[in-house]
Amino acid sequence: MPKQDSLWLKSLRWIQKHLVHTIVVPQDPFADLNLDASRPLAYVMKTESLSDIAALSEITTKLGLPSPYEPLVVNGVVAPRVVCLEGRKPLFGERASNEPFLECFMRLLAVHKEKPELDIQLVPVSLYWGRTPGKEDDTMKAAVLERENPTWLRKCLMILFLGRHNFVQFSNAVSLRYMADEHGTDMGIAHKLARVARVHFRRQRKVMTGPVLPNRQAMFHSLLKSESLRKAIQEEAASKKISETQARETAIEYLDEIAANYSDSLVRIAERFLTWLWNKLYSGINIKGAEQIRQLHHDGHEIVYVPCHRSHMDYLLLSYILYYQGMVPPHIAAGINLNFWPAGPLFRRGGAFFIRRSFNGNKLYTAVFREYLDQLFAKGYSVEYFSEGGRSRTGRLLAPKTGMIAMTINSVLRGIERPVTLVPVYLGYDHVMEVATYHKELSGKKKQKESVWQVFGAIRKLGNFGQGYVNFGEPITLQNFLNETAPNWRAEVADDPEQKPTWLTPAVNVLANRVMTRINDAAAASSITLTSLVLLASEQNALERCLLERQLDLYLTLLKRVPYTSFTSVAEGDGKHLVQQGLELNKFSINADPLGEIVSIDANQAISMTYYRNNIIHLFIIPSLIASCLTNNKQISRAHILGIVSDFYPLLKAELFMGIKDLPSYVNQVLDLFIEQGLVQESDTLSVVTEHTSQMLLLAGSVSETLQRYAIIFNLLAHRPKMERSELESESHLLAQRLGALHGITAPEFYDKKLYNTLSVKLKELGYFSEKEDKSDVERIRDQANSLLRASVRQTIVASVTAEHIV
């Protein structure tokens, strides 16, 4: 390797500095890959390349990592900082032997034998000039821009045309101490290291670029030859009394309507536009858990992303983040309503495939869609769909639509060998552009049809929207899920592939709910969501600034000391910092008087802010319920609190997709924290410390509307034990409207009919609609709910339930 200060390398670095723009994956290798700055470090690269090392040198300088030009000096032994698996490819002739590079491995291993305390970190580094996967019929372009093994001439062309799309990816370090201790230090181990590294680099390239793209028309013809589609076409012809040719043409029309037409060129252009857009919209995008997903890709999993659905921005945000995290944007299942000009064709070339809201018993369309989805999985393309089926209008997760999840499981049952893994994704925003529209729709206004004018209208209103949040939840590998749910599933499917297993529908429902629960497990508690939660629990949606900051400090402590899950993310900073962030985004108002500052939510903004509160209310609903038990009882035992929480938890779990694994332990940890923080004192029983009553009342306020709903339901059930589910839903909704009008409850979800349907389904599952005479459970929970309400609210509910018109 030429010396760093040689004229040749200086000239090369100067040229590349002006032609090359490099993106680093991950952005902070020290933090994301747990590199140890105190231990020696060497780089492993696939191919020796002056331009690659020059690009790496620029990055290591910015990150504070050792320069690839600096030799590695350990225990008197001098070795190159970069170990390459193979030499440069000459313009003509054979590549040089890789023996010099194996000798580097040998020298580094030998030093470990001599010095037991030494542990060199071997960090694989991959460089990519562009990320085009190529097409199945690609010839000329592949020849000119051969990316895996380019000659110096081809590399010059790549830098010239693709220099602005250079990616440098660092991987987890390999401990040479471990290799030396476990496997020895001979030449055989050096060869083994080289083989493992080659496999790693091959897989890494597949993760970064994705599989080759199909020729769309060739793919259509291939799909039409499949046995299931041939059979569906024959059945369509017979049922509609048309020729098979006509039925086949209909199938082609369906394929053309559904199928994506992924274009790497469009993705590169979109990347530049989206970089501009995010910089204009957001002050930052916070990402958690991307490394585990990269590893799943690397291990050969078929990845299906299942995000929550807050905004039309979701389609763009997740694809953009995955691209910059060194993964390929997925093929996205989009509603057919988004297939309008010019957005539809652009979305399609960005990887969207379109799905009708309802298949309406159209067997041919169903068969075409299933076969297309199977093809995506078989070819190794990652897929994304929104299991909620539409955007949440309240900020809470919607009950899942199980169609796409069922199709995914069916693809596994039909014999996909690679592990298929669902990745729940929490998407959050400090500002959702559509919130105002959502509340108009909830109040009865008809939903507007998507159009290009809506897009232009949204872009015209772009401003400072704070931060975005992308948290990857705990993955679910479907083969493991099926082994857990139906241990003999492989044998059952092999015996009768056409027969639908009896356990399939219940398994799909369980899986859908597990996905939603794991999305909520990965929630992001941000400055906006936390501050909204506090202010909306106050009487006038207003608090003294110092009290607001103190309450936020308590919530931050609670989330950090008693974490909801390890996948949840919590805002950085203290309460003071969070309040300031909210004020800078104009989400809250501040007024000063001689006694201090008051932070409030404007009356016309209160309904909108419930959306952000609802994003994270599940994180605080149990602590809030505990606080409600404490503030409504002068003395109360731990056992009594746990009993109340245990009675309400099944409903909370169904409504808010909660997944607390050990409820008694969680309740006790929260109580212990309250005691440690001086909020609660304990002798034989628990009681609130007088000077902290206001803090506990504020925390208790977050569960009040939920308890009011439960009080309505259980008062109705206790008063009319034999009422039907449909009656309970309609009369609960009617009472909620009355209660809201009398007591000023404006939260949209309080009047959401779907929510009462979800609760009634859970109540039936729990046996509350049974014919048995003993209604002590219903009466007990009714009394518990009533005891936790304000007297005026309780009186309204009881009086309304017993009134003649409701009976």
Swiss-Prot record:
SMART domains for the chain: PlsC (SM00563)
Catalytic activity: sn-glycerol 3-phosphate + an acyl-CoA = a 1-acyl-sn-glycero-3-phosphate + CoA
Cellular compartment(s): Cell inner membrane
InterPro entries recorded: GPAT/DHAPAT, GPAT/DHAPAT_C, GPAT/DHAPAT_LPLAT, GPAT_PlsB, Plipid/glycerol_acylTrfase
Pathway the protein acts in: Phospholipid metabolism; CDP-diacylglycerol biosynthesis; CDP-diacylglycerol from sn-glycerol 3-phosphate: step 1/3
Keyword NADP: no
GO biological process: CDP-diacylglycerol biosynthetic process; fatty acid metabolic process
Keywords: Acyltransferase, Cell inner membrane, Cell membrane, Lipid biosynthesis, Lipid metabolism, Membrane, Phospholipid biosynthesis, Phospholipid metabolism, Transferase
A cellular component term, taken from the record's GO annotations: plasma membrane
Free-text note regarding domains: The HXXXXD motif is essential for acyltransferase activity and may constitute the binding site for the phosphate moiety of the glycerol-3-phosphate.
Record family assignment: Belongs to the GPAT/DAPAT family.
UniProt name for this protein: Glycerol-3-phosphate acyltransferase
Gene name linked to the record: plsB
